[in-house]
Each structure stands twice: as structure tokens, then as C-alpha cells.
């Protein structure tokens, strides 16, 4: 589903789409959102198939559709606000406020929960790799990757870079600014490995025969993706959690997983726990 962007707030014009501190402190978040008729959603737009921004300004992806369902249940429209992995935390905590919540591939971690609010998980996740299909048999473990001759490419500021820095002491780690460009760079031979997620890897394998994800069924970590927001928005957090629970109960969350080719991890769980084994 492509969602037309009602208003795009560029990185150079956040002042036009910030939320006044007085209005935030004066009344509950949901009341403020419904009165203005719009929920502002921060998203990176670089993470297929969870959040991607097309050149014409439309957004699509699993997380974008979850955001759409939150807006639908609130009875408001959506305004997407660009953020990035290096600036995500700062953007959530910014004064004046830049957006109401952030969505799209954001892993639930203890560190994030210490300073911000995170919803229950709506998508299982874990670290894995992309490599060239011709070399898939070469990589059977993390030890096979952690060698000086292996070029490992990651995007800056997120958990992919953090995982690489903490677990790869010998590999040649290359930081590339645009996450969405890394798969094609691996396919072209400009890097050997991309550290990515089990949510992202299948999309690129399905769309590029030069790529493979040989460790997809053996992720290095196990976690959950959730919705991120600043502290003090407890009413909005409760509403988001209830939306996730209702989507599980009515089957719409399962259908979204099937639409995007993602593994549904909630068959025995009607109320998702954090299921988090990733600590920042």
C-alpha cells in the first residue's frame, strides 16, 4: 500500500512541523492529535519492506501500514516526518517536539526504554547477513565473516553498526550513509557482507538474484520491532498497544506479515511481550 504524504517536513524545515511545548504539556497526547486532525510520524524511509519513501514522496511498507491503522483508529490523517538512524533518538526527544511517534524497523531495546517509550512488539526481528549468492557457501557462522579480507558494510548510527562494532574485531567494517544502497553495492562487489535484519534480507534476495541470505534461519540476535515515542505520552502508548493487540486478534497483523513475506511470531501470543534479547 502506498500512502500519499499529506505533508512532508524536510530536514531543513522542521520548524514548520514541530509541536509547541505548551500544547504538549497542556493536554493529553491523543486529545491534542485528534483536535489537530493529524498524527505526525517519524520514519527513516530507507528500510524496505518496513518503511520506504519513493521519489514522488509516497511511503510504503509494513510499518507504514501499521501507522496507517493507528491513524485510522484515531480518526486522523498522517503527516510523515523524515528522520534517520543516527538522529532517531535526538529527534524523538527534541524540543520543540518533531513528531508524535516513530515507526519502521525500530528494535525494542533496554537502552531505548530507559529514555523513551516503546510499544509492545508487532514484528519479530534479528540480525543476519546479505552476501553475493555466488559466495553463500563461504559464510556459515559469524567466525567466517570476522576475517580481515571480508568487507562488511553497515549504515551509520543504528543497531547494525553497533552489532558490527561489538562482534567483528577483524573484518573490514565500512560505513555507508544510505542503508538502501548497500544491497546493490554488495551485489556489485564493492562490499562482501551487509549486516541487516531478518525482516529486510528476504526482500532483497527476492528482488536480486545476485544476493543471498545464507544465515536467515539462524539469526545472530532475537528481538522485536515496536513503535517509539517520547516519555509522557502514556495515553498514546496505551492506544498503540491496544491497536497492536486488536490487529493480532482480528487477523490483520497476520495478513500484513503474509503480504510482505515476513514470519508471523505471535501464534501463541495474544499480548506481545518485548521478547527482547538485544541490549544497547
Predicted regions and their residues:
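Short helix-initiation/N-cap motifs at beta->coil->alpha
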Residues: 26-28, 64, 80-91, 137-139, ...
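Beta->alpha turn/N-cap motifs
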Residues: 42-47, 81-86, 97, 101-109, ...
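Periplasmic-binding protein-like
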Residues: 45, 124-131, 198, 202-245, ...
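Acidic, polar ligand-binding/catalytic clefts
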Residues: 68, 72, 77-144, 212-213
Amino acid at each position: 500500500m502506498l500512502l500519499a504524504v499529506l505533508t512532508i517536513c524536510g530536514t531543513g524545515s522542521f520548524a514548520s512541523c514541530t509541536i509547541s511545548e505548551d500544547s504538549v504539556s497542556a493536554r493529553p497526547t491523543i486529545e491534542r492529535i485528534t483536535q489537530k486532525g493529524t498524527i505526525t510520524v517519524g520514519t527513516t524511509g530507507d528500510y524496505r519492506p518496513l518503511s520506504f519513501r519513493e521519489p514522488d514522496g509516497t511511503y510504503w511498507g509494513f510499518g507504514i501500514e501499521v501507522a496507517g491503522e493507528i491513524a485510522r483508529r484515531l480518526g486522523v490523517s498522517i503527516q510523515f516526518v523524515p528522520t534517520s538512524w543516527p538522529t532517531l533518538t535526538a529527534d524523538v526527544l527534541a524540543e520543540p517536539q518533531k513528531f508524535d511517534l516513530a515507526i519502521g524497523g525500530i528494535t525494542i531495546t533496554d537502552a531505548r526504554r530507559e529514555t523513551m517509550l516503546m510499544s509492545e512488539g508487532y514484528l519479530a526481528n534479528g540480525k543476519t547477513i546479505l552476501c553475493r549468492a555466488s559466495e553463500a557457501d563461504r559464510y556459515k557462522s559469524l567466525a567466517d565473516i570476522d576475517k580481515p579480507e571480508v568487507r562488511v558494510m553497515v549504515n551509520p548510527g543504528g543497531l547494525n553498526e553497533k552489532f558490527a562494532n561489538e562482534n567483528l574485531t577483524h573484518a573490514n567494517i565500512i560505513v555507508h550513509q544510505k542503508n538502501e544502497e548497500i544491497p546493490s553495492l554488495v551485489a556489485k562487489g564493492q562490499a562482501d557482507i551487509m549486516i541487516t535484519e531478518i525482516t529486510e534480507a528476504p526482500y532483497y534476495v527476492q528482488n536480486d538474484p545476485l544476493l543471498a541470505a545464507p544465515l536467515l534461519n539462524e539469526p545472530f540476535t532475537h528481538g522485536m520491532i515496536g513503535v517509539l515515542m517520547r516519555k509522557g505520552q502514556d495515553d498514546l502508548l496505551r492506544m498503540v498497544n491496544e491497536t497492536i493487540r486488536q490487529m493480532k486478534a482480528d487477523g490483520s497483523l497476520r495478513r500484513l506479515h503474509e503480504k510482505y513475506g515476513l514470519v508471523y511470531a505471535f501464534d501463541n501470543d495474544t499480548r506481545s511481550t518485548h521478547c527482547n534479547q538485544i541490549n544497547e
